[in-house]
């Protein structure tokens, strides 16, 4: 695979290899055949980052070969959304001959939605001044005149210039209901929107007969907790990043959800609070004992759950675990399988044509 060519004819074979690999990895914990969720074969990534290469008068996006580290020119990127591909050409055309925009530009980041909104961030090794702002405003207006719903941001050391806003609002159809998700530039969002819809619908399906409340750790912008709110009496969710917490609060209001509470704290801190080890001012007014959480949802970073959180989640009758790294999932399962059984297993092809796998497991207490 190269950045400008996807081996779409090999999609089925690469997916089958992942299914076999996941089943083998999970064999010590479950004999289940994974439920498999396919990605679109192209134009599935909603965000992308490129370095910029200045070659005389020419200017173009580049990526680096992961093995050789050699530079690869990228004029089109079929893994990314159609909107990103359109913007890549439009941005180069708008920046190439404009000194204020081109000088010391080293990277462009693209974030798009299925609702055809975009935030484009231009990263510089220079101080951004009023001349840059005027040139960027003119470029933004020219892009909008082409029918592109785009917002531009300039970034440099200790500097961030928003021409109007640093977010876009995604709209996803999830199990018969449209969900609105504010996505903030430079914050984590699910990269494959079509796969995100399938993950949300799978999570809804496996928790459809739930009792009591839901606790979620690492909730981000509320991606899962807001969609799952319809299956539970109440949802209590934690997140550490301020922009993500602010986006989650907006998303709660935008979706008219009244049974979700977001707390800004790390999973490790929440574990301490639940165990009565420490008290936190951020929990004032929230009585944790009022929540009857029979299900806990975790979507941890690639490192998986730390040992203290492992112990904490074992106290819940049901654990819903979304993993972007099955190796650390299996490491966690060495502990979790002592008290819980894997009752559902799913593979989500979040990153086609790569080694990476995303998977979900539902664990029920023995």
From Swiss-Prot:
Catalytic activities: uridine(54) in tRNA + S-adenosyl-L-methionine = 5-methyluridine(54) in tRNA + S-adenosyl-L-homocysteine + H(+); uridine(341) in tmRNA + S-adenosyl-L-methionine = 5-methyluridine(341) in tmRNA + S-adenosyl-L-homocysteine + H(+)
Alphabetized InterPro entries for the sequence: MeTrfase_TrmA_AS, MeTrfase_TrmA_CS, SAM-dependent_MTases_sf, TrmA_MeTrfase, U5_MeTrfase_fam
GO MF term (any one): tRNA binding
Presence of the UniProt keyword Protease in the record: no
PANTHER family for this protein: TRNA/TMRNA (URACIL-C(5))-METHYLTRANSFERASE, TRNA_TMRNA (URACIL-C(5))-METHYLTRANSFERASE
SUPFAM superfamilies linked: S-adenosyl-L-methionine-dependent methyltransferases (SSF53335)
EC number: 2.1.1.-, 2.1.1.35
Family under the similarity heading: Belongs to the class I-like SAM-binding methyltransferase superfamily. RNA M5U methyltransferase family. TrmA subfamily.
Keyword tags: Methyltransferase, S-adenosyl-L-methionine, Transferase, tRNA processing
A cellular component annotation (GO) from this entry: cytosol
Highest taxon of source: Bacteria
Active site, renumbered: 324, 358
Positions of disulphide bridges: none
Function: Dual-specificity methyltransferase that catalyzes the formation of 5-methyluridine at position 54 (m5U54) in all tRNAs, and that of position 341 (m5U341) in tmRNA (transfer-mRNA).
GO biological process, one term: tRNA methylation
Residues the entry annotates as binding S-adenosyl-L-methionine: 190, 218, 223, 239, 299
Name this polypeptide is given: tRNA/tmRNA (uracil-C(5))-methyltransferase
Pfam families: tRNA_U5-meth_tr
């Amino acid at each position: 695979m190269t950045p400008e060519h996807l081996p779409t004819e090999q999609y089925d074979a690469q997916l089958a290899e992942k299914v076999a690999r996941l089943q083998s990895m999970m064999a010590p914990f479950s004999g289940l055949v994974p439920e498999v969720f396919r990605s679109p074969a192209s134009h599935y990534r909603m965000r992308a980052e490129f370095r910029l290469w200045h070659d005389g008068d020419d200017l173009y996006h580049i990526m680096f070969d992961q093995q050789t580290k050699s530079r690869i020119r990228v004029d089109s990127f079929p893994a990314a959304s159609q909107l990103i591909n359109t913007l890549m050409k439009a941005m180069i055309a708008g920046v190439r001959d404009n000194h204020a925009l081109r000088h010391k530009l080293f990277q462009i980041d693209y974030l798009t939605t299925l609702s055809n909104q975009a935030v484009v961030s231009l990263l510089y090794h220079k101080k951004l001044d009023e001349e840059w702002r005027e040139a960027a405003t003119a470029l933004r207006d020219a892009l909008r005149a082409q029918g592109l719903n785009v917002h531009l941001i300039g970034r440099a050391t200790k500097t961030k210039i928003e021409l109007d806003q640093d977010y876009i609002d995604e709209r996803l159809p999830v199990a018969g209901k449209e969900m609105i998700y504010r996505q903030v530039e430079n914050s984590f969002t699910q990269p494959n929107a079509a796969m995100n819809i399938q993950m949300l619908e799978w999570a809804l399906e496996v928790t459809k007969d739930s009792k009591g409340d839901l606790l979620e750790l690492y909730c981000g912008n509320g991606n899962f907790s807001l969609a799952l709110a319809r299956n539970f009496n109440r949802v209590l969710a934690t997140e550490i990043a301020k922009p993500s917490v602010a986006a989650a609060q907006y998303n709660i209001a935008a979706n008219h959800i009244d049974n979700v509470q977001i707390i800004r704290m790390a999973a490790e801190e929440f574990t301490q609070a639940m165990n009565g080890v420490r008290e936190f001012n951020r929990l004032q007014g929230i009585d944790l004992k009022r929540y009857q959480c029979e299900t806990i949802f975790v979507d941890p970073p690639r490192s998986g759950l730390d040992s203290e959180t492992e112990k904490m989640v074992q106290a819940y009758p049901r654990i819903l675990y979304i993993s972007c790294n099955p190796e650390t999932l299996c490491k966690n399962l060495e502990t979790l399988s002592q008290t819980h059984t894997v009752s559902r297993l799913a593979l989500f092809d979040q990153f086609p044509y790569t080694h990476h796998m995303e998977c979900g497991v539902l664990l029920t207490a023995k």
